[in-house]
Amino acid sequence: LVFEPYAYEALKTANEKILGIEGLPAYHMDKADVLVSLGADFLETWLSPVEYARKFKAMHALNRGRKGFFCHISAYQSLTGANADLWLSCKPGTEAHVAMGLVHQAITSGRGKNLPESLLSSIKQVSLPFTKEAVVLASGISAENFDRTATRLTTAKKPLIVGPGSACGNALQTNMAVNLLNLIFDPQLMLFDFEGRHRVETAARRSQVLAFFERLNQEPVDLLLLNNTNPVFSMPWESTVIEALKQKRLFVVSFSSFMDETTALADLVIPTRLPLETWDEYSGRRGMVSTLQPAMGHLTEAPSIGDVFLCSNGGKKPDNYTKYLYRHLKQKKKFETTKAWAQTIQQGGIFKQNHRTPSFQPPEIEPVFFHKAFDNLLLPSTSELAFMAVPSIRFFDGRGANRPWLCEVPDPLTKIAWQTPVLMHPQTMKTKGFAQEDMVEIQSETGRLNAPVYETEGVHPGIIVMAIGQGHQNFG
Protein backbone atom coordinates (compact mmCIF):
# COMPACT_ATOMS: atom_id res chain seq x y z
CA LEU A 1 0.00 0.00 0.00
CA VAL A 2 1.43 3.39 -1.02
CA PHE A 3 0.42 6.04 1.51
CA GLU A 4 0.64 9.69 0.49
CA PRO A 5 -1.35 12.31 2.44
CA TYR A 6 -1.66 14.42 -0.71
CA ALA A 7 -2.97 11.66 -2.97
CA TYR A 8 -4.78 14.00 -5.41
CA GLU A 9 -7.97 11.96 -5.12
CA ALA A 10 -10.25 14.70 -6.42
CA LEU A 11 -8.01 15.28 -9.43
CA LYS A 12 -7.70 11.56 -10.21
CA THR A 13 -11.44 11.02 -9.90
CA ALA A 14 -12.20 14.03 -12.11
CA ASN A 15 -9.80 12.70 -14.74
CA GLU A 16 -11.53 9.33 -14.61
CA LYS A 17 -15.04 10.80 -14.87
CA ILE A 18 -14.35 13.34 -17.62
CA LEU A 19 -11.28 12.04 -19.48
CA GLY A 20 -11.70 8.31 -18.89
CA ILE A 21 -8.23 8.07 -17.31
CA GLU A 22 -7.79 7.35 -13.60
CA GLY A 23 -4.40 8.94 -13.27
CA LEU A 24 -2.42 12.16 -13.20
CA PRO A 25 -1.20 13.28 -16.63
CA ALA A 26 1.49 15.91 -16.84
CA TYR A 27 0.87 19.30 -18.43
CA HIS A 28 2.78 21.15 -21.15
CA MET A 29 2.44 24.37 -19.19
CA ASP A 30 5.39 25.90 -20.98
CA LYS A 31 3.46 25.84 -24.27
CA ALA A 32 0.38 27.70 -22.98
CA ASP A 33 -0.23 31.37 -23.72
CA VAL A 34 -2.91 31.78 -21.03
CA LEU A 35 -2.82 29.86 -17.75
CA VAL A 36 -5.67 29.84 -15.25
CA SER A 37 -5.19 28.09 -11.91
CA LEU A 38 -8.09 27.37 -9.59
CA GLY A 39 -6.24 26.64 -6.37
CA ALA A 40 -3.36 24.71 -7.97
CA ASP A 41 -0.25 25.83 -6.08
CA PHE A 42 2.19 24.45 -8.63
CA LEU A 43 5.13 26.54 -7.36
CA GLU A 44 4.89 24.95 -3.89
CA THR A 45 3.26 21.55 -3.40
CA TRP A 46 1.13 20.65 -6.45
CA LEU A 47 2.22 17.50 -8.31
CA SER A 48 5.80 18.45 -9.30
CA PRO A 49 6.78 21.98 -8.19
CA VAL A 50 10.31 21.91 -9.62
CA GLU A 51 9.04 20.81 -13.03
CA TYR A 52 6.18 23.29 -13.15
CA ALA A 53 8.27 26.17 -11.82
CA ARG A 54 10.55 25.68 -14.82
CA LYS A 55 7.62 25.38 -17.22
CA PHE A 56 5.89 28.40 -15.71
CA LYS A 57 9.05 30.46 -16.13
CA ALA A 58 9.15 29.50 -19.82
CA MET A 59 5.45 30.26 -20.27
CA HIS A 60 5.68 33.60 -18.47
CA ALA A 61 8.94 34.80 -20.03
CA LEU A 62 9.05 37.63 -22.55
CA ASN A 63 9.25 36.11 -26.03
CA ARG A 64 9.21 38.27 -29.17
CA GLY A 65 7.62 41.10 -27.28
CA ARG A 66 4.91 38.93 -25.69
CA LYS A 67 4.52 36.89 -22.54
CA GLY A 68 1.92 34.46 -21.26
CA PHE A 69 -0.87 35.62 -18.95
CA PHE A 70 -1.42 33.88 -15.61
CA CYS A 71 -4.54 34.15 -13.44
CA HIS A 72 -4.79 32.44 -10.06
CA ILE A 73 -8.18 32.00 -8.36
CA SER A 74 -8.24 30.94 -4.72
CA ALA A 75 -9.39 31.88 -1.23
CA TYR A 76 -5.86 32.78 -0.13
CA GLN A 77 -2.77 34.03 -1.90
CA SER A 78 -0.04 31.42 -1.91
CA LEU A 79 3.40 31.88 -3.47
CA THR A 80 1.85 30.74 -6.73
CA GLY A 81 -0.89 33.35 -6.42
CA ALA A 82 1.68 36.03 -5.59
CA ASN A 83 3.35 35.36 -8.96
CA ALA A 84 0.11 35.74 -10.91
CA ASP A 85 -0.66 38.63 -13.24
CA LEU A 86 -4.14 38.56 -11.74
CA TRP A 87 -5.12 37.02 -8.41
CA LEU A 88 -8.84 36.65 -7.77
CA SER A 89 -9.81 36.22 -4.13
CA CYS A 90 -12.89 33.99 -3.92
CA LYS A 91 -14.85 32.55 -1.03
CA PRO A 92 -13.48 29.12 -0.02
CA GLY A 93 -15.14 26.31 -1.94
CA THR A 94 -16.48 28.50 -4.75
CA GLU A 95 -13.69 27.71 -7.20
CA ALA A 96 -16.13 25.23 -8.80
CA HIS A 97 -18.70 27.99 -9.27
CA VAL A 98 -16.09 30.18 -10.98
CA ALA A 99 -14.94 27.32 -13.21
CA MET A 100 -18.50 26.51 -14.28
CA GLY A 101 -19.11 30.21 -14.87
CA LEU A 102 -16.12 30.22 -17.22
CA VAL A 103 -17.57 27.13 -18.92
CA HIS A 104 -20.84 29.01 -19.43
CA GLN A 105 -19.03 32.04 -20.85
CA ALA A 106 -16.94 29.90 -23.20
CA ILE A 107 -19.99 28.06 -24.55
CA THR A 108 -21.89 31.34 -24.93
CA SER A 109 -19.00 32.84 -26.92
CA GLY A 110 -19.13 29.95 -29.39
CA ARG A 111 -16.25 27.80 -28.17
CA GLY A 112 -16.52 24.01 -27.96
CA LYS A 113 -18.02 23.44 -31.41
CA ASN A 114 -15.51 20.67 -32.14
CA LEU A 115 -16.79 18.56 -29.25
CA PRO A 116 -19.24 15.71 -29.88
CA GLU A 117 -22.73 17.20 -30.15
CA SER A 118 -24.13 15.16 -27.26
CA LEU A 119 -21.29 16.19 -24.94
CA LEU A 120 -21.53 19.85 -25.91
CA SER A 121 -25.29 19.80 -25.36
CA SER A 122 -24.87 18.29 -21.88
CA ILE A 123 -22.22 20.84 -20.91
CA LYS A 124 -24.35 23.70 -22.19
CA GLN A 125 -27.38 22.49 -20.23
CA VAL A 126 -25.57 21.97 -16.92
CA SER A 127 -23.75 25.33 -17.15
CA LEU A 128 -26.92 27.39 -17.66
CA PRO A 129 -27.37 28.30 -13.95
CA PHE A 130 -23.77 29.58 -13.71
CA THR A 131 -24.30 33.00 -15.19
CA LYS A 132 -21.86 35.80 -14.50
CA GLU A 133 -24.25 37.34 -11.98
CA ALA A 134 -24.71 34.04 -10.12
CA VAL A 135 -20.96 33.35 -10.01
CA VAL A 136 -20.11 36.85 -8.79
CA LEU A 137 -22.71 36.57 -6.04
CA ALA A 138 -21.54 33.13 -4.90
CA SER A 139 -17.77 33.67 -5.13
CA GLY A 140 -17.30 37.29 -4.12
CA ILE A 141 -15.04 38.14 -7.06
CA SER A 142 -15.86 41.24 -9.09
CA ALA A 143 -17.75 41.13 -12.38
CA GLU A 144 -14.92 43.10 -14.01
CA ASN A 145 -12.27 40.54 -13.06
CA PHE A 146 -14.52 37.64 -14.05
CA ASP A 147 -15.02 39.21 -17.49
CA ARG A 148 -11.31 39.88 -17.81
CA THR A 149 -10.46 36.23 -17.11
CA ALA A 150 -13.16 34.89 -19.42
CA THR A 151 -12.03 37.18 -22.24
CA ARG A 152 -8.41 36.11 -21.83
CA LEU A 153 -9.44 32.45 -22.11
CA THR A 154 -11.76 32.81 -25.07
CA THR A 155 -9.22 34.82 -27.08
CA ALA A 156 -6.23 32.62 -26.24
CA LYS A 157 -4.64 30.29 -28.79
CA LYS A 158 -3.36 27.73 -26.29
CA PRO A 159 -5.11 28.17 -22.94
CA LEU A 160 -4.53 25.75 -20.06
CA ILE A 161 -6.61 25.48 -16.90
CA VAL A 162 -5.48 23.52 -13.82
CA GLY A 163 -7.37 22.64 -10.65
CA PRO A 164 -6.66 22.03 -6.95
CA GLY A 165 -4.68 19.06 -5.69
CA SER A 166 -5.48 19.04 -1.99
CA ALA A 167 -8.89 18.33 -0.52
CA CYS A 168 -11.14 21.37 -0.25
CA GLY A 169 -14.78 22.23 -0.65
CA ASN A 170 -16.11 21.09 -4.04
CA ALA A 171 -12.61 19.96 -5.10
CA LEU A 172 -13.98 17.14 -7.26
CA GLN A 173 -16.44 19.42 -9.05
CA THR A 174 -13.75 22.07 -9.50
CA ASN A 175 -11.44 19.60 -11.22
CA MET A 176 -14.28 18.23 -13.32
CA ALA A 177 -15.16 21.75 -14.47
CA VAL A 178 -11.47 22.40 -15.18
CA ASN A 179 -11.35 19.32 -17.42
CA LEU A 180 -14.49 20.49 -19.22
CA LEU A 181 -12.89 23.88 -19.82
CA ASN A 182 -9.79 22.27 -21.30
CA LEU A 183 -11.96 20.09 -23.56
CA ILE A 184 -13.98 23.10 -24.72
CA PHE A 185 -10.87 25.06 -25.73
CA ASP A 186 -8.91 22.06 -27.04
CA PRO A 187 -10.82 18.78 -27.61
CA GLN A 188 -7.54 17.01 -28.46
CA LEU A 189 -5.96 18.15 -25.16
CA MET A 190 -2.65 18.91 -26.83
CA LEU A 191 -1.28 20.46 -23.62
CA PHE A 192 -1.81 17.20 -21.70
CA ASP A 193 0.92 14.55 -21.53
CA PHE A 194 -0.82 11.21 -20.99
CA GLU A 195 2.38 9.21 -21.48
CA GLY A 196 4.46 11.00 -18.84
CA ARG A 197 1.98 10.63 -16.00
CA HIS A 198 3.05 11.50 -12.45
CA ARG A 199 4.00 8.53 -10.29
CA VAL A 200 2.11 9.89 -7.28
CA GLU A 201 -1.01 8.58 -9.04
CA THR A 202 -0.14 5.18 -7.55
CA ALA A 203 -0.91 6.45 -4.04
CA ALA A 204 -3.81 4.70 -2.34
CA ARG A 205 -7.05 6.54 -1.79
CA ARG A 206 -7.86 7.66 1.72
CA SER A 207 -10.73 5.16 1.87
CA GLN A 208 -8.27 2.37 1.01
CA VAL A 209 -5.87 3.48 3.74
CA LEU A 210 -8.66 3.62 6.32
CA ALA A 211 -9.91 0.19 5.23
CA PHE A 212 -6.36 -1.18 5.50
CA PHE A 213 -6.03 -0.16 9.14
CA GLU A 214 -9.57 -1.38 9.85
CA ARG A 215 -8.53 -4.82 8.60
CA LEU A 216 -5.50 -4.75 10.88
CA ASN A 217 -7.91 -4.36 13.80
CA GLN A 218 -10.12 -7.22 12.66
CA GLU A 219 -7.96 -9.80 10.88
CA PRO A 220 -5.16 -11.98 12.34
CA VAL A 221 -2.18 -10.08 10.92
CA ASP A 222 1.05 -10.54 12.88
CA LEU A 223 3.59 -8.32 11.02
CA LEU A 224 3.39 -4.78 9.66
CA LEU A 225 6.28 -3.03 7.86
CA LEU A 226 6.26 0.76 7.61
CA ASN A 227 8.79 2.56 5.43
CA ASN A 228 9.33 6.24 6.30
CA THR A 229 5.66 7.01 6.65
CA ASN A 230 3.75 8.71 9.46
CA PRO A 231 0.01 7.95 9.21
CA VAL A 232 -0.53 8.66 12.92
CA PHE A 233 0.22 12.33 12.27
CA SER A 234 -1.30 12.59 8.79
CA MET A 235 -4.54 10.62 9.14
CA PRO A 236 -7.66 12.02 10.85
CA TRP A 237 -7.78 11.72 14.62
CA GLU A 238 -10.93 9.60 14.47
CA SER A 239 -9.29 6.96 12.24
CA THR A 240 -8.25 3.61 13.73
CA VAL A 241 -4.54 3.93 12.93
CA ILE A 242 -3.38 4.22 16.55
CA GLU A 243 -5.61 1.37 17.70
CA ALA A 244 -4.27 -0.86 14.93
CA LEU A 245 -0.63 -0.15 15.76
CA LYS A 246 -1.25 -0.88 19.45
CA GLN A 247 -2.62 -4.38 18.76
CA LYS A 248 -0.66 -6.81 20.96
CA ARG A 249 -0.71 -9.57 18.35
CA LEU A 250 0.72 -7.20 15.69
CA PHE A 251 4.49 -6.73 15.49
CA VAL A 252 5.21 -3.34 13.94
CA VAL A 253 8.54 -2.59 12.26
CA SER A 254 9.28 1.01 11.31
CA PHE A 255 12.09 1.77 8.87
CA SER A 256 12.80 5.35 9.88
CA SER A 257 15.74 7.51 10.87
CA PHE A 258 13.52 9.78 12.98
CA MET A 259 11.30 9.11 15.96
CA ASP A 260 7.98 10.39 14.65
CA GLU A 261 4.47 9.70 16.00
CA THR A 262 4.12 6.41 14.10
CA THR A 263 7.63 5.15 14.83
CA ALA A 264 7.06 5.79 18.54
CA LEU A 265 4.38 3.08 18.47
CA ALA A 266 6.56 0.51 16.66
CA ASP A 267 7.93 -2.63 18.32
CA LEU A 268 11.15 -2.45 16.31
CA VAL A 269 12.78 0.61 14.78
CA ILE A 270 15.36 0.10 12.03
CA PRO A 271 17.09 3.34 10.95
CA THR A 272 17.90 3.33 7.24
CA ARG A 273 20.22 5.32 5.05
CA LEU A 274 19.11 8.69 3.77
CA PRO A 275 18.66 9.18 0.00
CA LEU A 276 22.12 10.78 -0.33
CA GLU A 277 23.73 7.78 1.41
CA THR A 278 22.52 4.98 -0.83
CA TRP A 279 22.14 3.67 -4.34
CA ASP A 280 18.58 3.71 -5.61
CA GLU A 281 16.27 4.84 -8.39
CA TYR A 282 13.05 6.80 -8.53
CA SER A 283 10.69 7.35 -11.42
CA GLY A 284 8.78 10.54 -10.72
CA ARG A 285 7.04 10.19 -14.08
CA ARG A 286 6.44 7.39 -16.54
CA GLY A 287 9.30 6.86 -18.94
CA MET A 288 11.80 8.50 -16.60
CA VAL A 289 14.40 7.00 -14.27
CA SER A 290 16.28 9.15 -11.75
CA THR A 291 19.25 7.51 -10.07
CA LEU A 292 20.48 8.10 -6.54
CA GLN A 293 24.02 7.48 -5.36
CA PRO A 294 25.82 7.83 -2.01
CA ALA A 295 27.19 11.32 -2.67
CA MET A 296 27.57 11.95 1.09
CA GLY A 297 29.16 8.60 1.82
CA HIS A 298 27.83 6.81 4.89
CA LEU A 299 27.04 9.14 7.77
CA THR A 300 26.08 6.22 10.03
CA GLU A 301 26.21 2.43 10.05
CA ALA A 302 22.52 2.24 9.10
CA PRO A 303 21.78 -0.13 6.19
CA SER A 304 19.76 0.70 3.11
CA ILE A 305 16.26 -0.71 3.21
CA GLY A 306 17.04 -2.64 0.04
CA ASP A 307 19.90 -4.47 1.75
CA VAL A 308 17.63 -5.28 4.71
CA PHE A 309 15.13 -6.99 2.43
CA LEU A 310 17.87 -8.82 0.52
CA CYS A 311 19.33 -10.14 3.79
CA SER A 312 15.93 -11.53 4.70
CA ASN A 313 15.79 -13.30 1.34
CA GLY A 314 17.71 -16.34 2.57
CA GLY A 315 21.07 -15.37 1.12
CA LYS A 316 19.94 -15.62 -2.51
CA LYS A 317 21.66 -13.55 -5.19
CA PRO A 318 22.24 -10.65 -5.59
CA ASP A 319 24.10 -10.14 -2.34
CA ASN A 320 23.69 -6.36 -2.10
CA TYR A 321 21.21 -3.72 -3.20
CA THR A 322 23.58 -2.00 -5.64
CA LYS A 323 23.89 -5.20 -7.68
CA TYR A 324 20.15 -5.75 -7.43
CA LEU A 325 19.48 -2.25 -8.72
CA TYR A 326 21.82 -2.79 -11.69
CA ARG A 327 20.16 -6.10 -12.56
CA HIS A 328 16.66 -4.70 -12.08
CA LEU A 329 17.15 -1.75 -14.43
CA LYS A 330 18.91 -3.91 -17.01
CA GLN A 331 16.05 -6.42 -16.99
CA LYS A 332 13.64 -3.53 -17.57
CA LYS A 333 15.81 -2.68 -20.62
CA LYS A 334 16.67 0.76 -19.30
CA PHE A 335 20.21 0.15 -20.60
CA GLU A 336 22.08 -2.69 -22.32
CA THR A 337 25.77 -2.40 -21.41
CA THR A 338 27.98 -1.53 -18.46
CA LYS A 339 29.05 1.60 -20.34
CA ALA A 340 25.42 2.68 -20.69
CA TRP A 341 24.98 2.13 -16.94
CA ALA A 342 27.95 4.40 -16.25
CA GLN A 343 26.46 7.07 -18.52
CA THR A 344 23.15 6.75 -16.68
CA ILE A 345 24.91 7.37 -13.37
CA GLN A 346 26.83 10.33 -14.80
CA GLN A 347 23.73 12.13 -16.04
CA GLY A 348 21.64 11.20 -13.00
CA GLY A 349 19.14 9.00 -14.78
CA ILE A 350 17.40 8.25 -18.04
CA PHE A 351 15.31 11.10 -19.37
CA LYS A 352 13.39 10.53 -22.56
CA GLN A 353 10.92 13.01 -23.97
CA ASN A 354 7.37 11.71 -23.69
CA HIS A 355 4.89 12.41 -26.44
CA ARG A 356 1.17 12.30 -25.81
CA THR A 357 -1.08 10.11 -27.93
CA PRO A 358 -2.55 12.46 -30.58
CA SER A 359 -5.78 10.47 -30.96
CA PHE A 360 -7.45 11.41 -27.66
CA GLN A 361 -11.22 11.30 -27.84
CA PRO A 362 -13.53 12.51 -25.04
CA PRO A 363 -15.50 9.60 -23.52
CA GLU A 364 -19.26 9.45 -23.71
CA ILE A 365 -20.79 10.88 -20.54
CA GLU A 366 -24.42 10.50 -19.56
CA PRO A 367 -26.17 13.89 -19.11
CA VAL A 368 -27.57 12.77 -15.75
CA PHE A 369 -23.99 12.50 -14.46
CA PHE A 370 -23.36 16.21 -15.01
CA HIS A 371 -26.53 17.15 -13.18
CA LYS A 372 -25.66 14.94 -10.20
CA ALA A 373 -22.25 16.61 -10.01
CA PHE A 374 -23.15 20.26 -10.50
CA ASP A 375 -26.81 20.79 -9.62
CA ASN A 376 -26.12 20.68 -5.89
CA LEU A 377 -22.79 22.42 -5.51
CA LEU A 378 -22.05 23.23 -1.90
CA LEU A 379 -22.48 26.92 -1.18
CA PRO A 380 -19.85 28.87 0.79
CA SER A 381 -19.91 28.42 4.54
CA THR A 382 -22.33 30.75 6.28
CA SER A 383 -20.37 30.64 9.52
CA GLU A 384 -18.91 33.87 10.81
CA LEU A 385 -15.37 32.59 10.43
CA ALA A 386 -14.01 29.65 8.41
CA PHE A 387 -10.66 27.92 8.98
CA MET A 388 -8.41 26.65 6.17
CA ALA A 389 -5.46 24.32 6.77
CA VAL A 390 -3.23 24.48 3.68
CA PRO A 391 -0.10 22.63 2.46
CA SER A 392 3.18 24.22 3.50
CA ILE A 393 5.99 25.14 1.14
CA ARG A 394 8.44 24.59 4.02
CA PHE A 395 7.05 21.49 5.73
CA PHE A 396 4.79 20.01 3.00
CA ASP A 397 2.42 17.88 5.10
CA GLY A 398 4.67 18.00 8.17
CA ARG A 399 7.34 15.52 7.10
CA GLY A 400 9.96 18.29 7.01
CA ALA A 401 9.10 19.94 10.31
CA ASN A 402 11.99 18.33 12.22
CA ARG A 403 14.66 19.94 10.02
CA PRO A 404 15.96 23.00 11.90
CA TRP A 405 17.04 24.70 8.68
CA LEU A 406 13.49 24.46 7.29
CA CYS A 407 12.14 26.00 10.48
CA GLU A 408 14.79 28.71 10.30
CA VAL A 409 14.09 29.62 6.66
CA PRO A 410 11.52 32.45 6.60
CA ASP A 411 8.23 31.83 4.85
CA PRO A 412 8.57 33.50 1.41
CA LEU A 413 5.41 35.59 1.85
CA THR A 414 5.16 36.43 5.55
CA LYS A 415 8.96 36.40 6.14
CA ILE A 416 8.26 34.65 9.45
CA ALA A 417 10.59 31.87 10.62
CA TRP A 418 10.32 29.16 13.30
CA GLN A 419 6.57 29.37 13.76
CA THR A 420 3.36 29.20 11.75
CA PRO A 421 1.04 32.19 12.17
CA VAL A 422 -2.68 32.44 11.51
CA LEU A 423 -3.25 34.55 8.39
CA MET A 424 -6.16 36.96 8.72
CA HIS A 425 -7.59 39.74 6.56
CA PRO A 426 -7.51 43.29 8.05
CA GLN A 427 -11.30 43.47 7.80
CA THR A 428 -11.66 40.25 9.78
CA MET A 429 -9.17 41.47 12.38
CA LYS A 430 -11.08 44.72 12.80
CA THR A 431 -14.38 42.86 13.20
CA LYS A 432 -12.88 40.54 15.81
CA GLY A 433 -10.85 43.21 17.55
CA PHE A 434 -7.51 41.50 16.92
CA ALA A 435 -4.14 43.20 16.50
CA GLN A 436 -0.95 42.03 14.79
CA GLU A 437 0.80 39.25 16.79
CA ASP A 438 -2.15 38.68 19.13
CA MET A 439 -2.31 35.06 20.27
CA VAL A 440 -5.53 33.30 19.29
CA GLU A 441 -6.86 29.85 20.12
CA ILE A 442 -8.39 27.71 17.39
CA GLN A 443 -10.58 24.93 18.71
CA SER A 444 -12.43 22.02 17.10
CA GLU A 445 -13.92 18.71 18.17
CA THR A 446 -10.53 17.02 17.90
CA GLY A 447 -8.26 19.53 19.62
CA ARG A 448 -7.03 23.06 19.96
CA LEU A 449 -3.98 25.11 19.09
CA ASN A 450 -2.58 28.56 19.81
CA ALA A 451 -0.86 30.76 17.25
CA PRO A 452 -0.09 34.45 16.61
CA VAL A 453 -2.16 36.51 14.17
CA TYR A 454 -0.55 37.81 10.98
CA GLU A 455 -2.37 40.57 9.11
CA THR A 456 -2.50 40.20 5.33
CA GLU A 457 -4.76 41.09 2.44
CA GLY A 458 -3.76 37.80 0.83
CA VAL A 459 -6.70 35.94 2.35
CA HIS A 460 -10.40 36.36 1.71
CA PRO A 461 -12.32 38.23 4.44
CA GLY A 462 -14.12 35.87 6.78
CA ILE A 463 -11.54 33.08 6.71
CA ILE A 464 -8.36 32.34 8.61
CA VAL A 465 -5.54 30.34 7.05
CA MET A 466 -2.79 28.29 8.65
CA ALA A 467 -0.11 26.14 7.00
CA ILE A 468 0.08 22.45 7.86
CA GLY A 469 3.23 20.92 9.29
CA GLN A 470 4.07 21.91 12.83
CA GLY A 471 2.41 20.63 15.99
CA HIS A 472 4.14 17.26 16.18
CA GLN A 473 4.15 15.35 19.46
CA ASN A 474 7.04 13.08 18.44
CA PHE A 475 9.46 14.06 15.71
CA GLY A 476 13.10 14.27 16.72
Predicted regions and their residues:
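Conserved short loop/turn motifs at secondary-structure junctions
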Residues: L137-I141, G163-N170, R197-E201, N228-F233
